[in-house]
C-alpha cells in the first residue's frame, strides 16, 4: 500500500502500477489533505475492515454529530483538528489536558497551529470538559481497541444532539456514568497505543462516510446547440419590398 505525500502525491509511475486506487473523500474547500501518517492509518483501517459506500444526503451538515477531542499533546491535537476540518467539521470541542491550545507558551501554540494548518483552517475550537457530556442526548465514546461494538456498527450520523468523543482511555470511560454513554472500538491492536491523530482521523473518516455527501439535484436543461447561425447584413445591403408590389407578379 502506497500513500501519497500531502504536497506532491504519488508519482505517475506508481499510480500506473497500482491495481486499485483509494481516494479519501475530504469535504473542505481549504484543508484538502490529511497528515500523511493519518492518511495511512485511515487507508489501512478500511483495507483491513472493509467499507460500505459513502452515503448521499440532501443536507449532510444536519446529519453531522458534534465532536469532542480529549488530548494532552499539542501536535497530536493540532493534527486531529486538521483532519476534522478536512472532513467537513466547522466546530470542535476540546478537553485540553495539557496540550496548551488555549493557554500554552507561544512556541507550543505555534507548533499546534502549524499541525492544524491553522493559516487556512476555519475550524472553531471550543473549550469543554467531561461535564459537557450532559448537554447531549446521545454520547458515543470511541476507543482505539477493546471488545466493544465496532465503530462501523454504530450510527454516527444523528446530528448535533449526538456527541462523539475521541481520546479517552478505557480507565476514563469507567469513571463516566454508564447509563449516559455508549462505547465503540476501532479494533486496533491491543497493547500498542496509537497516536491521537490516528484514532481521530479514522473516526472522522467513518463519520464522513455515514454522514455522506450532498446528493446531486436533477440535471438542468442543457443550452441549445446550433450548427449554423444567421449572420446579419449591414443596412446598405438590405432591400425593403412593399407587399403590394408583390401582387403585380
Can you say where each PLM-predicted feature lies in the sequence?
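Generic recognition of short, well-ordered alpha-helical segments
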Residues: 13-16, 34, 79, 198
Amino acid at each position: 500500500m502506497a500513500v501519497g505525500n500531502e504536497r506532491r502525491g504519488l508519482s505517475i509511475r506508481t499510480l500506473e502500477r497500482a491495481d486499485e486506487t483509494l481516494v479519501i473523500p475530504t469535504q473542505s474547500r481549504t484543508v484538502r489533505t490529511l497528515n500523511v501518517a493519518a492518511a495511512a492509518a485511515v487507508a489501512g483501517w478500511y483495507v483491513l475492515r472493509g467499507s460500505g459506500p459513502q452515503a448521499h444526503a440532501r443536507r449532510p451538515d444536519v446529519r453531522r454529530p458534534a465532536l469532542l477531542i480529549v488530548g494532552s499533546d499539542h501536535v497530536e491535537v493540532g493534527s486531529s483538528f486538521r483532519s476534522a476540518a478536512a472532513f467537513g467539521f466547522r466546530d470542535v470541542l476540546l478537553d485540553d489536558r495539557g496540550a496548551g491550545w488555549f493557554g500554552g507558551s507561544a512556541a507550543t501554540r505555534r507548533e499546534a497551529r502549524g499541525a492544524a494548518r491553522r493559516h487556512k483552517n476555519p475550524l472553531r475550537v471550543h473549550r469543554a470538559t467531561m461535564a459537557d457530556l450532559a448537554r447531549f442526548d446521545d454520547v458515543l465514546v470511541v476507543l482505539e481497541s477493546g471488545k466493544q461494538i465496532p465503530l462501523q456498527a454504530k450510527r454516527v450520523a444523528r446530528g448535533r444532539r449526538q456527541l462523539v468523543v475521541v481520546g479517552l482511555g478505557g480507565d476514563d470511560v469507567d469513571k463516566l456514568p454508564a447509563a449516559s454513554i455508549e462505547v465503540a472500538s476501532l479494533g486496533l491492536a491491543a497493547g500498542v497505543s496509537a497516536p491521537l491523530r490516528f484514532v481521530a482521523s479514522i473516526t472522522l473518516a467513518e463519520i464522513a462516510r455515514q454522514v455522506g455527501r450532498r446528493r446531486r439535484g436533477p440535471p438542468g436543461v442543457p443550452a441549445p446547440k446550433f450548427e449554423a447561425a444567421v449572420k446579419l447584413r449591414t443596412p446598405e445591403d438590405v432591400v425593403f419590398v412593399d407587399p403590394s408590389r408583390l401582387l403585380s407578379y
